[in-house]
Amino acid sequence: MIKFIVFTLFTLNLFAVDLITLYRNEGINSVQKEIENQLKEKKYWEEYLKDKNVDLGYYESKKFVLLAQKEQAEIALYKKDENDYKFVLKNNMIHGENKGDKFTEGDKKTPNGVYELTQKKTDVDSFYGPFALVTSYPNIFDQSLDKKGSGIWIHGMPYNAARENFTKGCLALNNPELENLEKNLDFNKSILLIAENEFKKATKEEIILILTSVYKWKDAWKNSNIDEYLSFYSNDFKRADKTGFSLFSEQKKSIFAKNEQKTIKFSNMDISPYPNSFGKTMFKISMDEDYQSPTVKFVGKKELFVEIINNQVKILSED
């Protein structure tokens, strides 16, 4: 914690004497509270991100970004360094036979969205080439929309045989290109963005708005401020189990009424622009959450799917 505070002190460009005085008079908890307040401020993130490229998103844990653009029939790999993305390679690909976003099983469409690579599957039929990289479709947002289907892979081509110039929904590359792609990434630290047409890059202003909003949302959650907390949710909010905003808000009001003391820590935050077929400016936020209260203890992944509308961040789905 001390290392975190010292690092943030210099990053924030605050007067060290002010924080030292605060520490001397009120203790380390007051210093931490002041720093947490700064995380809700636009000024901090403007300074922190000023030299960083966020075109493909903001990543604290992911090291590789795969960008698939269906209309262009191309998939590109980028490697993240400290402040930028290094272009690694680009390959032609084939995708679902039918255009558009995937909604139903068997529609022969490739989904638009953001997905993890969950597994390298080697026990595949020779029709799929040497192996397949399994994606996380359907994700939480897909499930909230009742999207159907599964088994969306990045795979190869049949050995010594021809095939159609399209798939049932997967992304497919020539086998040497698939093998070269896999050699150049760590699928456990990769994110896949699938866009229908040309990918819409994120802006620094969007990422800053999301980061400040996440920390304001966390603060409202921590302090059981139900009105402010719920203000971050869209009226169209829906969980994967189809729980809508009305029932969700009633559940949260009951929990917040207990006014329990709690600590909430976020780390390894990743923010990805979310290509979609709804005309929304969407992002997927993934982070590690450490939640501790007298009645609930949770350490694990937290995912938010949000849209920016009228310069506000609204949560559409959550896990």
Feature roles, as predicted:
Residues 4-12:
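Sec-dependent N-terminal signal peptides
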Residues 17-58:
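Extracellular/luminal recognition modules and glycoprotein regions
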Residues 42-151, 161:
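Gly/Pro-biased beta-strand-loop elements
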Residues 92-98, 154-158, 289-292, 316-319:
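Short, solvent-exposed aromatic-acidic interface loops
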Residues 107-112, 119-215:
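Exported/periplasmic cell-wall-interacting domains
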Residues 206-225, 232:
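Short, aromatic-enriched amphipathic alpha-helices that serve as compact interaction elements
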Residues 230-273:
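Short solvent-exposed beta->alpha transition segments
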Residues 273-319:
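Exposed beta-sheet edge and beta->alpha loop/turn motif
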